[in-house]
Amino acid sequence: MQWETVIGLEIHAQLATQSKIFSGSSTAFGAAPNTQASLVDLAMPGTLPVLNEEAVRMACLFGLAIDARIDRQNVFARKNYFYPDLPKGYQTSQMDHPIVGKGHLDITLEDGTTKRIGITRAHLEEDAGKSLHEDFQGMSGIDLNRAGTPLLEIVSEPDIRSAKEAVAYVKAIHALVRYLGICDGNMAEGSLRCDCNVSVRPKGQAEFGTRAEIKNVNSFRFIEKAINHEIQRQIELIEDGGKVVQETRLYDPNKDETRSMRGKEEANDYRYFPCPDLLPVVIEPEYLAKLREQLPELPVQKRERFESQYGLSAYDASVLSASREMADYFEKVQGICGDAKLAANWVMVELGSLLNKDGLEIEQSPVSAEQLGGMILRIKDNTISGKLAKMVFEAMANGEGSADQIIEAKGLKQVTDSGAIEKMLDEVLAANAEQVEQYRAADEAKRGKMFGFFVGQAMKASKGKANPQQVNELLKKKLEA
């Protein structure tokens, strides 16, 4: 039997506000436990929440960016459940009247095609605290620094059909919230977490299968692996005569498996009711109109502009627009050197390799956009060859100065004097007279391979400084003379 996978994702984006959603406590990451928890966060009797307007603004920005309906009046609700790191015994969230209604996001698949994923809703809520197990023998500690941190929960329609599509969607959301400046997207610190709802059904069947929810997956790689494992688990279970149970599961990256955590709750299990401590939030059309003017160029728009303005391929434009910082860096380099394709190649290949090796983000690059743009200018004006440029790039990454300073200090200036190159080539050919005779006696197919030998000898003799194009042209003339 052929199976179809159905996936819906719930992404929790931690909003980049300076203070919590209902209190004035700081949201800075990494503070000592319980140093950023106010009386409101501790749920002390008599304290009342005050809504953070910045969180509302950020949620509305997101809604505008996904072309969603934004409710003029939205209501906060209490989601009732007990957990040690939830001091109030309920979480303030939104249920029937979320701030952001139906919208959509287009994702680019591996084959270059575009797919539209529906977004059911996005609502504001507060995060819970954190249970700490490692440092307490036989006990658990509670850190309430995170309690009350504003979250935007983004719920997709069940439109996703594979683990790779799921990753593409999460990457698109990740890029979008970073472009908007509403979330730093740091998955390692928990700023962006994903719950994956996975089910399978026989191909052609309209009715959904029973879903399992994989909680709190925090990397693109783990999302793909967790979903693939869960798909396989469900198919094997059904084919062996079993039934999929609606439940919450956890992904264990060390064992590459999901395991049951608890039975999956439904909305009525949480006994939602409107929060009596918070008034409904009214969002006027004039407010949204002003916000719309603040929207930056979004990832899809930037990618399309890179293709049309700079003539980049769809793939290159997609990579370079993946983050706002990467796009800004590329445009600075291009603005200096005036060659978009050369700039794209150096940013994606050489710089990308350096950043990946050292685990750095583009904003932490040891080579500035000004330095890289200046170096590419020296390639264009034939001061250095592409091969020598790699040496210059490495030196810039090591903090040895600008391209011009390094070229001068290391004597890397390319030899472009035709007379000097001809003299050097004569010496190379004289030293390899036997190979010259073999070349002249060979057919075209063999000559192609042998020509590379002479080029290599010439570049070796010039210590890589001879202009490769001139070497090729002059060498061909001499060998065929």
From Swiss-Prot:
It comes from Pseudomonas aeruginosa (strain ATCC 15692 / DSM 22644 / CIP 104116 / JCM 14847 / LMG 12228 / 1C / PRS 101 / PAO1). Heterotrimer of A, B and C subunits. One of its GO terms (biological process) is glutaminyl-tRNAGln biosynthesis via transamidation. It catalyses: L-glutamyl-tRNA(Gln) + L-glutamine + ATP + H2O = L-glutaminyl-tRNA(Gln) + L-glutamate + ADP + phosphate + H(+); L-aspartyl-tRNA(Asn) + L-glutamine + ATP + H2O = L-asparaginyl-tRNA(Asn) + L-glutamate + ADP + phosphate + 2 H(+). Belongs to the GatB/GatE family. GatB subfamily. GO terms for molecular function: asparaginyl-tRNA synthase (glutamine-hydrolyzing) activity; ATP binding; glutaminyl-tRNA synthase (glutamine-hydrolyzing) activity. Disulfide bonds: none annotated. This is Aspartyl/glutamyl-tRNA(Asn/Gln) amidotransferase subunit B. Keywords: ATP-binding, Ligase, Nucleotide-binding, Protein biosynthesis. Transmembrane segments: none annotated. It holds the Pfam family GatB_N. It comes from the Bacteria.
